[in-house]
Amino acid sequence: MMTVKRRIFDRIRNALTLAFGLIYLIPLYMAVTNSFKTYADIIKSPLALPTAPTLDNFVEAFHASNIASLYGTSILITVSSVALLILISSTAAYVIIRRNNGICKFLYAFALIGIMVPPVVTLVPSIKTLSMLHLLYKPSGLLMFYGGAYFSTTIFLYTGFINSIPISLDESAYMDGASTITIFFRIIFPLLKPCTATAVILMGMWIWNDFLNPMYILGSTAGRTITTGIYNAIGAYTSQWNLVFANVILASFPIVILYLCMQKQFMSGLTAGAVKG
């Protein structure tokens, strides 16, 4: 009886897995295949493989959408935001774990509240604050927003990892005359590579793919990111879906490369966090 129930459960689970997998894979399949088709081929058979693949869509989209400028703005904001998050979160996590007093525990618990609050909820108050600080419509304003919005998640990653590092390493370095800053940056931080890789990929992906926050915080005066630029391109190319799909692939390319380059460290960070955290 249990075997029959188990088989039914497995079939339902597999069917649901397949259904949800198709929901995610079909749009990806369409974006990739249609980016290599002409407009006529897309209208004729949007789900078919390209019979005569062409790279003209990418060339035209690259020049027409000014992808180079969009890449530059997005890379500047993403790299700066991720670097700021890693620096602040790792040092804060180190102090919280090593001090381990009531104040640090309270501040850590207070910081984790941000995980339960979606960044979009804080968008309007953040816009008001940035306007008061004269940072609205400036890349530095968006940088500050990301630093606050994703601080909770990043410090959560680092505290779990640093907690697994023996304090005896610090004590030995103190006996040799090393300062706290030297101990952290020369001994502790190099041990955080798996956690840092996880943070880089997660934060980099979220910030690179973010659309709503750059649209409102940067506006149209401080330069467009890759997502807001693609949004404007879609408005201009509603009758040229081959260019729309090419733009989407060009926007996704850097994140795919980042993941492929850091895949080993990313998986190591996830498994280490699961075992040690």
Show where each model-derived region lies.
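A structural signal for multi-pass alpha-helical bundles of membrane permease subunits
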Residues: T3-G277
